Structures are given as C-alpha cells and as structure tokens.
Amino acid sequence: MHCTAVMDLSFRQAISGDLEWLFDTDKRTMRVAVAQVYVWDEDSQRAGFAKSVRQGACQIVTWEGKQCGFVHWEVEPDLVWLRMLCIVPDMQHKSIGSQAIAKVMSLSSRLKKPLYLHVLVCNRAAYDWYRKIGFVEIENDGRVCTMMFDSSSPSGTVGQHG
C-alpha cells in the first residue's frame, strides 16, 4: 500500500553511536543484491560507514522518533554523488525514500551541480524507481549502472513511490 500523504520526516547527522544500526540496516536491505555482484565483506562495509560518519556525509532519516533509513551523499567540485539511500524494509513504500532523495535533489539544484548515483543492475526495483523519478542511465557495465538526474525530464519530479 502506498502512502499518499507526505510524512513529517526529520534528518539528523549520523554519529559514531549509529554505526551498528547503519551497518545492520545496510546488511538487511542490501546484502543479497551486493552478494550477487560482489563478495559481501562485512569489515569493508563497516569501514565504509565509519568513514562516511567521520566525514559528516551521512544523515539518519527519522519519522515519529523512529529511525527509518539513511541517506549518504557527497558534494564534489563538479557534481553531487548519492552514495546510498537505504530505507528499512518495514518502512519502504511509504514515500520516505522519495522525501529523502528530494532533499538531495534540492541540494544538487541549489548548488547547480548534477546528481549522480550508482545502482546495482540486479536491484531492479531501485533501478526502475530511479528511472521513474527522472534519472537517466549514462553508463552500464552489466553489474553497476551509473545514473544522472535529468532535471529537464518531464518525469523529473519525485512522486509518492519510494
């Protein structure tokens, strides 16, 4: 069931105390897809979250005080990278992802920099959703697809689907 009302989400900076929750959420949502393309390496995954938290590039998404996902992006000199958007399984399909990515799209627009992301080709639900909200495929090696947000696309608005 899709929620059509906008949820009152909050975003806060991830801190070192969030590392285990970030890792667990990533593992629950992404392990199967990652293992289809790469070897799942828990040490590498944990190290990646520790680095993103140290750099201040990861935000926890909360709704009614409950952690329901996280979004990780990096601003580079000529673009914005959406490194990861992850919503806990029981909170998916409630527009949380749509609102979280809208925050990053707004940042990209304000900075006048294109928004890029990588999506695993085997993660068809994510791939299809990114296409639906206006991302275009610019590179695909059969395992990982690089996509860019095309703000001129007629479908380049975030609907209530994520």
Where are these regions (language model features)?
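Conserved beta-strand in the GNAT
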Residues: 66-74, 81-86
